Amino acid sequence: MALGGLISNRNFGSFIGSGNGCQRLGKSGAEVSKLFPNALLCRNHQPLQASLHHESGHMRRSFGCFLQPRMDSVIRFRNSIKINRSRAYYKSEESDITEGVVPSADGSAEAILVEGNLQNASPWWQQFPRRWVIVLLCFSSFLLCNMDRVNMSIAILPMSQEYNWSSATVGLIQSSFFWGYLLTQILGGIWADKFGGKVVLGFGVVWWSFATIMTPIAARLGLPFLLVVRAFMGIGEGVAMPAMNNMLSKWIPVSERSRSLALVYSGMYLGSVTGLAFSPMLITKFGWPSVFYSFGSLGSIWFLLWLKFAYSSPKDDPDLSEEEKKVILGGSKPREPVTVIPWKLILSKPPVWALIISHFCHNWGTFILLTWMPTYYNQVLKFNLTESGLLCVLPWLTMAVFANIGGWIADTLVSRGLSITNVRKIMQSIGFLGPAFFLSQLSHVKTPAMAVLCMACSQGSDAFSQSGLYSNHQDIGPRYAGVLLGLSNTAGVLAGVFGTAATGYILQRGSWDDVFKVAVALYLIGTLVWNLFATGEKILD
């Protein structure tokens, strides 16, 4: 029986042989009769004439499946083989073989099998785009980043009771994280641009995870040890954003840039939600040290996955397909790692200063809301501490949702032909003017529910910044994306430190309306600077 009669209803592969293959042609043609592990048999319809053509090993590789041929009986002649019966077993499903003509005199020609329209050739997880594997790994690292950061805000309550810390001491402990965090913003960008994002981000996660695990031990040793460990944790987390930005600038094409960054940054928001939700449960059941031990241990699991699947750039990934490489690179060649940072050139560009100033204005309002929100809910809206804690989760959830919506909108606008400059200005204007509007309404609302809604809408519109200034570093200088983010985020962290302290000073002498007015003023300044000087064009090469 011919193989063509056994395998049907699927387009599986094709025969080629000397430019042509095998095809049934009635009595004057040839047909496929038998496949051996290392050979292909073509037979014409002349009596007892058959030819066996070997294709050592290559046939199986190009066929791309498991074929187990079996021959029940073969009668051998001096120059031919007569097939009484043959079978081929395909271990997945039946398939057709595309056939062609063999123009040789005896009905035979050298033939091989080539891979055709294979379906389900590999598991779905192997077909998943490699660039989005990198995005998901960065997303999960940012999830861990904020889980490990916010757990102290919950654990500090039982810790301060156990060790009799004053409010001033608690404030010192909370601020010690930023000592280290500030140190590695620019350094993290330099290291990532020189040595690759994989090394730097992997180092950062291991470093801050170890510091998280060491926190209970340091607290028992004494306050100075705890301050050092918290500063060390800040050092590790400080490299995360520059290293991530460096990697995505190499892995993600511009048409997917906004949504990929939005997804990664939403990991931070969801990390805060997860940390705020699970920390009280762990503390109640196992004690406050359990929060640090459990959250910190998750970093080791992430690091193993990072070592296995992450690469600093597409050219380092041996499993990256040529098709995906073309999508990522868009016809351009991958650049060599940065050896010298052109600081004078970078700092001479107005769009760079637009990034720095806008990042400062953005983070002033964001840090104030996220730091002082529980106090506002408790003192002004008269929610109890439990209610305040639950309501603090709402803005983080809102930001996670709207960051991804904004990313999708931005990439859609780019794909439809709107310039990157206009897209970045539109998205960041929403990220500035939205919070400014909703914060200005807080003095006019009459109910706590409306106040909570205004706060949530403020943070939701703020999340559009992920497709504005947070995506712009890769636009204007992809080779220096890590350094650029380190520069602007340093300004952002300083805004958080000074803004948080200034809010306390304002509240001692004024009101919450004054706090919100300062934030609104900075949002408006940021809008003006951004729209005057920002660009989406590459200015650093």
From Swiss-Prot:
Alphabetically ordered keywords of this record: Chloroplast, Membrane, Plastid, Plastid inner membrane, Transit peptide, Transmembrane, Transmembrane helix
Tissue: Expressed in stems, developing siliques, leaf mesophyll cells and sepals of mature flowers. Not detected in roots. Detected in palisade tissue rather than spongy tissue from the leaves.
Residue ranges of the TM segments: 133-155, 170-190, 199-219, 221-241, 263-283, 286-306, 352-372, 390-410, 430-450, 481-501, 515-535
GO biological process, one term: xanthophyll cycle
Principal subcellular localization: plastid
Annotated organelle transit peptide span: 1-28
Activity regulation (UniProt): Insensitive to dehydroascorbate, p-isoascorbate, inorganic phosphate, glutamate, ATP, p-aminohippuric acid or tetraethylammonium.
InterPro entries reported in the protein's UniProt record: MFS (IPR011701), MFS_dom (IPR020846), MFS_Na/Anion_cotransporter (IPR050382), MFS_trans_sf (IPR036259), SLC17A9-like (IPR044777)
Topology of this chain in the membrane: Multi-pass membrane protein
Induction: Expressed with a circadian rhythm showing a peak during the middle of the day (under long day conditions). Up-regulated by light.
Presence of keyword Lipid metabolism: no
Keyword match Chloroplast: yes
GO CC entries: chloroplast; chloroplast envelope; chloroplast inner membrane; plastid
Compartments in which it is found: Plastid, Chloroplast inner membrane
Family: Belongs to the major facilitator superfamily. Sodium/anion cotransporter (TC 2.A.1.14) family.
Job description of the protein: Inorganic phosphate and probable anion transporter. Ascorbate transporter bridging the chloroplast envelope. Transports ascorbate from the cytosol into the chloroplast. Requires chloride ions and the presence of an electrochemical potential across the membrane for activity.
Protein name (record): Ascorbate transporter, chloroplastic
Lineage: Eukaryota, Viridiplantae, Streptophyta, Embryophyta, Tracheophyta
